[in-house]
From Swiss-Prot:
Name this protein carries in UniProt: Probable hydroxyacylglutathione hydrolase 2, chloroplastic
Family: Belongs to the metallo-beta-lactamase superfamily. Glyoxalase II family.
Bilayer-spanning residue ranges: none
Species this chain originates from: Arabidopsis thaliana
EC number from the UniProt entry: 3.1.2.6
Length: 331
């Protein structure tokens, strides 16, 4: 499998389906991930090939090329839109119907610029949770395009402009694509994730990050553990689209408590390379997270030993200790 060097992410262990072509930037720049027809073309060369670490990878995301990623049969396109300092919004475009949605628009202008560039309207706004850095663009986008806001029924009073309130196990349709609603509390009480089984993609907001999980602002370790366990039960080739570009700092923490994990070592080096090139590390894959994310591996003896977690501690207790260690970690 050929490695991708110019345009990549943590999911770029999947072969690009066509040659990369330079494109003009959208403010601040946009990467378009086309989830087109085809089967998974390969899984993580990273597992067998060491990659060199590059320095100074914490700069803002700037993406000037587009890359098509073969996944499963689907007409859904997913476009990554950097917002604020380290947030990602995601534009969803169904090729068959032209329907467009956006997940977690923290601000309106970058989303409007991306839509205008492709002469597209906006039909839906999907929010994973109520925090302003995920809903800040709701009202302006709704006012301009007449888009309907989709969110958690538990956060009905906290999501600006909400029109459709969904609860756990609901199935909502986006232009013929079935969307499974998963309640994933922990970061907030009303957090939900949007799972598109036909595209093997999940939007996890601030519940699951690459190599980490969200801070426990409103929930408990028990809630976060249950949420993460639900998410990792999805197929290994599921692409994970989270709310922030935190992977570089997360990798440093993960290595500090599990320095002998060779898969993590290679992935951390690859992440550093991407950030040095000002490229996103998102999407990641479920398989990679299961192998490297300490919050998904709370029973691991090396992690427990590094943090002094008692053998008698259950997984929720261990997750709470790991979360507190991450909160206090200085790279």
């Amino acid at each position: 499998m050929q490695a991708i060097s110019k345009v990549s992410s943590a999911a770029s262990f999947f072969r690009c389906s066509r040659k990369l072509v330079s494109q003009p930037c959208v403010r601040p720049c946009v990467r378009q991930l086309h989830v087109r027809k085809g089967l998974v073309s390969g899984v993580m060369k990273l597992f067998s090939s060491p990659l060199r670490t590059l320095r100074d990878a914490g700069k803002s995301v700037r993406i000037s090329r587009f890359c098509s990623v073969s996944n499963v049969s689907s007409s859904l396109q997913i476009e990554l839109v950097p917002c604020l300092t380290d947030n990602y919004a995601y534009i969803l475009h169904d090729e068959d119907t032209g329907t467009v949605g956006v997940v977690d628009p923290s601000e309106a202008v970058p989303v409007m610029d991306a839509l205008q560039k492709n002469s597209r309207n906006l039909t839906y706004i999907l929010n994973t949770h109520h925090h302003y850095d995920h809903t800040g663009g709701n009202l302006e986008l709704k006012d301009r395009y007449g888009a309907k806001v989709i969110g958690s029924a538990a956060d009905r009073d906290r999501i600006p402009g909400i029109d459709v309130a969904l609860k756990d196990a609901d199935k909502w349709m986006f232009a013929g694509h079935e969307v499974h609603i998963m309640e994933t509390p922990g970061h907030t009480r009303g957090h939900i994730s949007f799972y598109f089984p036909g595209a093997r993609a999940i939007f996890t907001g601030d519940t699951l990050f690459s190599l980490s999980c969200g801070k426990l602002f409103e929930g408990t370790p028990e809630q976060m553990l249950a949420s993460l366990q639900r998410i990792i039960a999805l197929p290994d080739d599921t692409s994970v689209y989270c709310g922030h570009e935190y992977t570089l700092s997360n990798s440093k923490f993960a290595l500090s408590i599990e320095p002998t994990n060779e898969v993590l070592q290679s992935y951390a080096a690859y992440v550093a390379e991407l950030r040095d090139k000002k490229l996103p590390t998102i999407p990641t894959t479920m398989k990679m997270e299961k192998a490297c994310n300490p919050f998904l591996r709370t029973e691991n003896t090396d992690i427990r030993r590094a943090l002094g977690i008692p053998e008698t501690a259950d997984e929720a207790e261990a997750l709470g200790i790991i979360r507190r260690a991450k909160d206090n970690f200085k790279a």
